[in-house]
Curated annotation (Swiss-Prot):
GO cellular component: cytosolic large ribosomal subunit
GO molecular function term, any single one: rRNA binding
Name of this protein: Large ribosomal subunit protein uL16
GO biological process: translation
Quaternary data: Part of the 50S ribosomal subunit.
Pfam families to which the protein is assigned, alphabetical: Ribosomal_L16
Length: 138
């Protein structure tokens, strides 16, 4: 699963996602993309599940790019622990996804196959998504 090798601070405040994506909102590498229609944090496990689903669907034919990276630590205290005694340990890593972020890209496959692979991947994600073609975003 994806996680950063090294971070400046181990723990971070939660924060929230507001507004639309200013960066990462255009298709840069592939022909087809999966764009988020909502803002949310996506875990490294969800990204991996979507990647596996896509690569199995396109088989050896195409190339898949993951455009998001989980670099936000999510902390959690153990179950049945009393309050206090400091912030909990890092449980998993999240990727912040704003509205309009291109999350995955595919190239080298027909449009129908790319669309079915992206829809399969979107079923693994907690946000509503849409399939886009490179010429749609220009």
């Amino acid at each position: 699963m994806l996680s950063p090798r090294k971070v400046k601070y181990r723990k971070k405040q939660r924060g929230r996602l507001s507004g639309e994506a200013q960066k990462g909102n255009k298709i840069s590498f592939g022909e087809y993309g999966l764009v988020s229609l909502e803002a949310d944090f996506i875990t490294a496990r969800q990204i991996e599940a979507a990647r596996v689903a896509m690569t199995r669907r396109v088989k050896r034919g195409g190339k898949v790019w993951i455009r998001i990276f989980p670099d936000i630590p999510y902390t959690k205290k153990p179950a049945e622990t009393r309050m206090g005694k400091g912030k909990g340990g890092v449980d998993h890593w999240n990727a912040p996804v704003k509205l309009g972020t291109v999350m995955f890209e595919i190239s080298g496959v027909p449009r129908e196959l790319a669309e079915s692979a992206m829809m399969l991947a979107s079923s693994k994600l907690p946000v509503k998504t849409t399939f886009v073609v490179r010429r749609d975003l220009r």
